[in-house]
């Protein structure tokens, strides 16, 4: 709760806060004992009832470093693929406000920056808000007005939904634990032509999705108002009001 003071003069306020997100409260429970594939056989795709893991068996698998298919052990090295893909999520809020109050009026200005780092790579939001307002009263004339500017921009908001671009489904539901997602951070074999991934028919490398299949936004919003009033008599006054709304 903020209360207006009665004292005249200059007032400067600085606030800063940082919050960290704990991640998902609940996630689907999935098995990590069998590889991708079906009917007891390893293969890439959207099924996860392939060969048994961690019992000494091998299968022809994709090597993300040599970009070749080689015979490798079937082990559950990707049990924590979703967790290992996620990043520390945080929200930082910084605000500076300055106000001046005098005998006939007051003026206030404020600048706020909010930075939200998402839990997936390349997910972040920047929001800047600047506002200025003032009021004045002198004899029979009074005036007040304000202007607020909002700017919001982010590089990508993909990855949270259902489908081929959904990280939760790609890493937890539709793929097995026989690969480590961290081995695929270098998601290009040939820049802008061929991605580094074991199966591009069903879905893409999650790091490729995060950095290349992007849906960004950058917008500016301006709101303003102006009000003036003149009292001719206790029962007669003239009022003028105007507003501004701009979006780009």
Language-model regions, residue ranges each:
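A beta-strand signature from Gram-negative outer-membrane beta-barrel systems
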Residues: 1-13, 86, 91-93, 106, ...
